Amino acid sequence: MTLLLAGDIGGTKTILQLVETSDSQGLHTIYQESYHSADFPDLVPIVQQFLIKANTPIPEKACFAIAGPIVKNTAKLTNLAWFLDTERLQQELGIPHIYLINDFAAVGYGISGLQKQDLHPLQVGKPQPETPIGIIGAGTGLGQGFLIKQGNNYQVFPSEGGHADFAPRNEIEFQLLKYLLDKHDIQRISVERVVSGMGIVAIYQFLRDRKFAAESPDIAQIVRTWEQEAGQEEKSVDPGAAIGTAALEKRDRLSEQTLQLFIEAYGAEAGNLALKLLPYGGLYIAGGIAPKILPLIQNSGFLLNFTQKGRMRPLLEEIPVYIILNPQVGLIGAALCAARL
């Protein structure tokens, strides 16, 4: 029996989990807590407080999924003034083995720990063992990556595919591209500027400014407040969530049009990734947005745009596509990584 510590470390929230592992029973969660990251100057006091409350021995191994790049076993969180160093963490926490992993890579590792109820199949396809697995996930940004089978395990390879160019396919998407280029006074638009939480807001602003439909007063006020708070780290409103809810409830035509365009672009980019990887092991849709707008994804052309790749369409129709419903998939991945240390 080995005691492990897994963590999902974000700019807003830090979730820690103690896990026991054994050869016969796999992983078993024994304690979990969530903390507001900004309340602490560093990860160390959070872990120390967590272990005192858990009242267990010091874990033998730990893996922390970090919202930011990992460089030479160090990490600077994207939205938090923390600098994490593996060697320092090991010394100050007394944990012999600590590993830092990118949060989207942790999602990749977590896929193997998901249960049937954690997934919603969008397309059954024709799964093929030993073939790549693809991951794409719109949230704050747009994560992309893939998994390759190595022995009895999978190796995860994150990428920066979300920063590839946005490729418009029809007149309205060309108009959107021109709008974003002019608005930001830049030479190129990454697909992340369209397929992400901020992308939802950008699409709404485009449709609003081009008079595609009238604004409803409540959504208009939320978006205006967000625009006025530009540059502030802490926002008082979440317009992406408000637009998504209004579209789901069919109470705001502009929000419905926004989500329609967003989902079409999301499906098209997922199809682009699938063409590059041919992930017959499955393409997994991660991130916080997809589960919240699942009815819209099912009915608003995601799969149509995913497979709409000319003569390559038959290939894409055979790729299994799943939406990950479990919001703790990254934490599961961190625990599985710790077990492999």
Swiss-Prot record:
It is found in: Cytoplasm. This is Glucokinase. ATP binds at G7, D8, I9, G10, G11, T12. It catalyses: D-glucose + ATP = D-glucose 6-phosphate + ADP + H(+). One of its GO terms (molecular function) is glucokinase activity. The lineage of its organism: Bacteria, Bacillati, Cyanobacteriota, Cyanophyceae, Nostocales. The keyword Zinc-finger does not apply. Keywords: ATP-binding, Cytoplasm, Glycolysis, Kinase, Nucleotide-binding, Transferase. The gene is glk. GO terms for biological process: glycolytic process. GO terms for cellular component: cytoplasm.
